[in-house]
Amino acid sequence: HPRVRRQRQMCIRDSYYRTRMTHTQAVSQIARGIAEGLKLNLYLTEAIALGHDIGHTPFGHQGERTLNDILRGKFDIIKNIKLFEKTNYFGGFKHNYQSLRVASLLEEEYTEICGMDLSFQTLEGMIKHTKLKKNEFMLEQFTNDNSANEHLHFEQVFCSTLEGQVVAIADEIAQRGHDLDDALSSGAMQFEDFQKYLTVKKMKELADIVNRVNDDIIAMNHNHRRFVDENELRNSRTVSAIVSYFINDVIRYSAVKINKYDYSEFEDNDYRVSKEIISFSETAATLNKYLETIITSKVINSPEVSLFDNNAHTIVKGLFKAYYNNPRLLHKGTQRKLYINLRNVSQNVVDFEYGNYEIIKEEFDLITGYDFNNDSTSELAKEYYEKRCVLVRIICDLSLIHI
């Protein structure tokens, strides 16, 4: 999907970086492997996996954090933002909710309906692949289906399909593999240092896996096998072996839980699961958490990543501020979207393409600058309150496409 193809996820050096597309491909592959091992619906699994990050910002999670901070009033950009926050009207920015918005509202695939016409099972898997922020978002900003709240089952934080739960854990496994690969390939962590981290008792299973990979390469050297880049091969095989370990662990542990699940309860619950069934074993969960801690200290907190995050923050914040302060900078197609969305909340809408320049300027000044501290109850205040909310979401949509 074009929304994920050029979005950098993490940057260590210019010649080595990962994008949302490579991450999505990895999640899809891992999820299919788990789903196949558990005899689940491969089509649903892949649909969720391929769509789970289409609402993500560029610059990895830093882009998401910056937009979230803007919408929650940490910067003086959106006028009267604190009044909006009291009602949780903005709530913040989360890429999983934005994925729902992209799939349900933004994409134009059909003449009859908005969005991509995905099943509720697919949409639920997309929005629940990461943590929810319940009661902080107004769902009508993200879908035009009035029954979405019922069918997305926000009463439980995990997915009501096993396929959705599979994608959530596949995302976790892929992230761990990516981060370890980045750490080793960039030189932020040497292979020997990684081996030392695994000498603690609780990491014995992973240590055995890593040592076997290293022993295999040494054995091939003794057999006069020559490698173009031995370190790169060792790193690649290590990451692959660790990812395979987690995949097999999830399949084995989850299969036991599936077999114990009361099928009559599943039938009575409209073929939805009411428990989190797809998971790591206790041992694998500990190993996963330890790996995350290592990588955070060696990579995420590194000066290179901090510089990248700082630049990302500056770009996202600067663009949002520029578009908010002067919406006429918005692309013609985006102004058309803004016009259409404003028509949904008010009949008093200016044609931004063919309207009078002074009238357009006055309208934008009111949308971005109307002071609700002086007037928060009149019909005019309510109108521009709604219009400002629309503009803010449209700018967030724009950041996903053009940065």
Stretches with model-predicted labels:
Residues 25, 29-32, 36-37, 54-259:
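Sequence-structural signature of the catalytic-core scaffold of metal-dependent phosphohydrolases
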Residues 38-45:
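Glycine-rich phosphate/pyrophosphate-binding loops
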Residues 215-390, 400:
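C-terminal subdomains that position terminal phosphate/3'-OH groups for nucleotidyl transfer/ligation
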Residues 13-17, 27:
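Sequence context of c-type cytochrome heme-c attachment sites
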Residues 23-26, 312:
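Phosphate/oxyanion-binding active-site loops and adjacent basic polyanion-contact surfaces
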Residues 1-8, 12, 399-402:
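Single conserved hydrophobic/aromatic residue that forms the stacking wall/gate
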Residues 46-51:
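Short alpha-helix carrying the canonical HExxH Zn2+-binding catalytic motif
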